[in-house]
Amino acid sequence: MKRFGYGAGSSTSKIAVAARFCFRGFLLFCADIIGEVTEITVKGGGMSEISCENIFQDHYDFWGHLSDKQKTYLISHTHEVHYKRGETLHYGGDDCIGVILIASGMFRIYLLSDEGRDVTLFRLYDHDVCMLSASCALDAVTFDVHIDAESETVGYLIEAAAFRQLMNENIYVKSFADEIIVENFSDVMWTMQQILFMGIDKRLALFLYDEMSRTGQVEIKMTHDQIARYIGSAREVVSRMLKYFVSEKMVELSRGGIRIVDKEKLRRLAG
């Protein structure tokens, strides 16, 4: 996900404030449509000043706008964290651990209905920033989403209280947070557009083509159940559609995976 820096008082930042307040209501609407706190491993308190500075300079646009005191404060409240595959790090509005920069791995952000059905809103990858794990740091906003680690993940966690304090003190930190929330809102809108207005054949083709493009591999190592969660469908529906793709010679199925054999045909179906 591309990051852009915003200066104090920018029009985009004002739009972001409005987006943050409508985001929660939109997610509640989505939840209507789709009808154990996990421990994290924290290595030793704060990270070293040198490693933190390198990380912040590379991935946080606001770093150059912090005072020396704010930089020291941020470093002392940043930790390296590790999550196992399948581990849940955020349970709706029940917790607020902080802002996480993903060094390596993947997070899945999803809605969970009262009946236990879930739908994936978006995923985050290497070098993305997870802001929704610090939803309590965002004024008057509660994001009722869950976040899982979809693979072994290493990240750098800024404690929620520390990030909130910096947002209150520094407009550039607040603008950075607003930018990410707007990006998340855009991702959610795209997901719901697919679920509401795209046929399952096109949604599945688009997902497979995007995964192939992202990984650079024609072998997609996912179960039918995983794919169903990602595209907001049922496993049985995905399985039937994959069999149709096989009959059209677009893919081949194997145990625990899918091989794309006709990229162009899949691309045309994905649109």
What are the residue ranges of the model-derived segments?
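Short, Lys/Arg-enriched N-terminal segments with co-localized hydrophobic residues
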Residues: G25-G46
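Cyclic nucleotide-binding regulatory module and flanking cytosolic helices
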Residues: E39, K43-K84, A134-L138
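A cytosolic small-molecule/anion-sensing beta-strand core signal
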Residues: K84-R85, A103-S104, Y125, S151
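Glycine- and acidic-residue-biased ligand/ion/polar-headgroup-sensing regions
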Residues: I97, L101-Y110, H127
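Cyclic-nucleotide recognition modules
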Residues: T120-D178
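Polybasic "coupling" helices that flank or enter modular domains
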Residues: E150-E152, N168-S233
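Phosphate-/nucleic-acid-contacting segments
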Residues: Y209-G271
